[in-house]
Each structure stands twice: as C-alpha cells, then as structure tokens.
C-alpha cells in the first residue's frame, strides 16, 4: 500500500473513498513511483473548488478536478522508481455527480483521480500531441485498473477524450 497518501473529505459525499487507496496504489506501481512518495487527495465542496479556482487561476467557475504539483516528478521505470512529493489532487464530488450521468459516480471519481495524478507527473493536454499522449495513457490506466479490480469494462464515456464528452469546465 502507498505509504504517504493523505485522504481528506469535506465534500459531504461519504462514498468518495471507494477504492481510492487501491487506485492510487495501482498508479504508484504502474507508473513506478516509490511508495514513500507523498500524495494528497481531497474531496471538497463546489464552493471550496470555486475558491481555489479564483485564488490560483483567477476564474470563478465550477471544476471537477484540480492538481497542484510540488516536486517535478515524471513516471519512473521498472529499474528506477521515482521518489518525491507529488502534490495534491482536489476533486469536487458535487460536480462529479452532475457529470456522471450515464455511468456510476465512482467511475468518474476514478477517472478524475487518474487525470489529476497524470497532471502531477507533468502530463498536460495543452496541444494535440500532448493531449493524445495524456488521454491515451489515462484510458489505458482506467481499463487496467478496472480489470485488476474486477469492475467490468469502463464505459466509453470515461475513456474518451473530454472534448468528445459533456463538459462542465474541466481544466
């Protein structure tokens, strides 16, 4: 199990943690992150998310996930695990609930934790090539996690790129 995972929930949605620890452990193993590396995952209210967006981005809007990297860490390799302070992933379950219309709430949570985790590792979707790389890896990670946890097949809606699915202001 991941050694320095800090989970926090101020959102009022008590089922946010469902398999979050297992997912993070899977991401550490799959992307060759040393299990002693720090990661924070927080589930917050829509008002808290808007406050973060205003403070850090100057934008007053809803968002489903934000990532705040600390150390510059990229995925490691089988022979060389990377170690450091990854940073924090912040998820708004209230927004997630609105987005998860045709698939289970927890599936959207998994997607956003993976998405946020990849941002902490330096992945981005600011241009077409980086977007393709990030979302291809994101889909593969989701599919592999679902297979590992016997969760069935993820819906196409959570494995396609965000520009093809309904959006509520993702970054």
UniProtKB/Swiss-Prot annotation:
Its cofactor is Zn(2+). Pfam families: YbeY. One of its GO terms (biological process) is rRNA processing. Its main location: cytoplasm. GO terms for cellular component: cytoplasm. Its EC number is 3.1.-.-. It is found in: Cytoplasm. InterPro entries: MetalPrtase_cat_dom_sf_prd, YbeY, YbeY_CS. Keywords: Cytoplasm, Endonuclease, Hydrolase, Metal-binding, Nuclease, Ribosome biogenesis, rRNA processing, Zinc. The keyword Methyltransferase does not apply. Single strand-specific metallo-endoribonuclease involved in late-stage 70S ribosome quality control and in maturation of the 3' terminus of the 16S rRNA. This is Endoribonuclease YbeY.
């Amino acid at each position: 199990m991941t050694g320095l995972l800090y989970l926090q929930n101020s959102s009022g949605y008590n089922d946010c943690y469902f398999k979050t620890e297992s997912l993070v452990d899977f991401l550490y193993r799959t992307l060759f992150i040393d299990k002693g590396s720090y990661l924070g995952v927080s589930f917050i209210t829509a008002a808290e998310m808007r406050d973060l967006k205003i403070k850090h981005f100057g934008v007053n809007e809803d968002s489903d996930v934000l990532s705040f990297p600390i150390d510059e860490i990229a995925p490691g390799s089988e022979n060389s695990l990377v170690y450091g302070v990854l940073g924090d992933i912040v998820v708004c379950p209230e927004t997630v609930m609105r987005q998860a219309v045709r698939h289970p709430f927890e599936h959207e949570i998994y997607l956003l934790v993976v998405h946020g985790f990849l941002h902490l590792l330096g992945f981005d979707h600011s241009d077409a090539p980086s977007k393709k790389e990030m979302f291809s890896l994101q889909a593969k990670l989701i599919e592999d996690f679902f297979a590992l946890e016997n969760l069935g097949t993820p819906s196409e809606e959570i494995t396609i790129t965000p520009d093809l699915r309904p959006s509520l202001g993702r970054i």
